């Protein structure tokens, strides 16, 4: 019986004495282990690509390859998280600028006419009020005992308006709240202008925001990303306004399609971004990772297509 604590070492750099135990476990490949199912599932995320038969590794697969796969996934998550951060900041800036200009109001977030009326979610049956949701977030942060520094400065310096200006309020929103705020805008013109900045139709943009929130949470919780089949699939981009990819890459439930979304959005934020070279460097650092599981397609000859030759990535 192997102590369950060895599983935790896959969440950090492996230390010498646990290394032997993990090798022994992998060689035995027994599920008679005193560990909960979530722990086994987490490990299995890195095992499955190397198994054609359940509980049996393919010939030639060693512990180093499994560990490399984990490290590759960790570095991929860090890269993705960094990209999402840059895009998220740009979305905040664009929404603040566009809406303040369209309504000639630095406090547009306090105008209920900017948002759709309360409605019932067709899936959950829950009542949704975008305006009131935003106001609750603002009130919670403005009345907190230890608010953000910029909120404290506003509260100590100004008495009216009660709420800070929009560019401060937007900094209080999580990615998910930002996504819901965009969907809750009443005027198509407002949504269109924000989406146009990123070269997208509003419907596609809102769908991508939803997926980006989902992936951000995956990264934040250190979950396996590289070969994940997405529960929240992004819309397929059928009418790109900028360079995109051939239809073979439209495997939108896999990670490479999401990486392509990040690249497309980053071009609007910084045309000279280095995502192509960073991703290529990561692939070269871990040459044994089966990247076909990320959603990179093969040609008729069965050979993986060269993603770097696609207009989006070149």
Short names for language-model regions:
Residues 6-14, 19-314:
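Long, contiguous internal "core" modules enriched in hydrophobic/ aromatic residues
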């Amino acid at each position: 019986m192997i102590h369950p604590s060895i599983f935790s070492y896959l969440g950090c750099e492996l230390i010498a004495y646990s290394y032997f135990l993990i090798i022994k476990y992998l060689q035995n490949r027994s599920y008679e282990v005193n560990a909960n199912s979530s722990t086994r599932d987490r490990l299995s995320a890195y095992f499955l690509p190397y198994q054609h038969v359940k509980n049996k590794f393919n010939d030639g697969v060693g512990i180093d390859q499994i560990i490399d796969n984990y490290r590759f996934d960790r570095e991929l998550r860090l890269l993705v998280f960094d990209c999402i951060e840059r895009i998220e900041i740009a979305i905040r800036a664009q929404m603040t600028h566009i809406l303040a200009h369209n309504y000639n109001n630095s406090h547009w977030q306090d105008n209920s006419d900017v948002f759709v009326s309360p409605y019932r979610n067709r899936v959950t049956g829950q009542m949704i009020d975008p305006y009131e949701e935003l106001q609750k977030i603002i009130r919670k942060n403005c009345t907190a005992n230890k608010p953000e520094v910029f909120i404290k400065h506003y509260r100590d310096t100004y008495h009216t308006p009660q709420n800070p200006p929009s560019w401060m309020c937007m900094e209080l929103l999580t990615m998910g709240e930002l996504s819901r705020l965009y969907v809750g805008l009443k005027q198509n013109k407002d949504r269109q202008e924000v989406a146009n900045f990123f070269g997208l139709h509003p419907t596609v943009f809102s769908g991508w925001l939803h997926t980006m929130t989902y992936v951000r949470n995956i990264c934040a919780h250190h979950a396996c990303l590289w070969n994940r089949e997405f529960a929240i699939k992004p819309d397929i981009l059928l009418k790109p306004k900028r360079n995109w990819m051939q239809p073979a890459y439209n495997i939108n439930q896999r990670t490479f399609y999401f990486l392509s979304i990040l690249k497309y959005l980053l071009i609007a934020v910084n045309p000279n971004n280095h995502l192509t070279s960073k991703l290529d460097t990561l692939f070269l650092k871990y040459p044994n990772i089966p990247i076909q599981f990320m959603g990179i397609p093969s040609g008729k000859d069965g050979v993986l297509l060269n993603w770097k030759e696609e207009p989006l990535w070149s």
